[in-house]
């Protein structure tokens, strides 16, 4: 029985590349926003066991439904890659629209916490698992015009460090 890897933001960039690489050895549960991009990715993956849904990861109800569907499809989850995210608005900190800032936090941090909450109970029950939270070099460099994005990714970095301490006793790993 193959291990199961969940990848959010699977239709572009890092998520897409991971799906292509991991599909050779793992069963996959993928989510992204674009039906067209997901269909193209599924064509590239060929004959492997993939469950997929397209939705906005910031939608609490859809995210929860995805978690329930994945657990029903596979019965377990071994690795979760929190990859969904974007720099949706480049602006000076003094000029950033607070609605844009809130959305970046929802997309880059809060939704990842929601995904952790969906799959943690499965990992805890079997005393095994790994959460991989994809961050950004912005956590190192904090460049101008990336205040909202950098802050949201920095928040996720902090959450990851705390999460590691909280789930370590359950034999669950966390890395960035």
Per-region residue spans from a language model:
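The beta1-alpha1 cofactor-binding region of Rossmann-like NAD(H)/NADP(H)-dependent oxidoreductases
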Residues: 54-65, 98
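Active-site loop immediately N-terminal to the catalytic Tyr-X3-Lys motif
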Residues: 93-94, 141-147
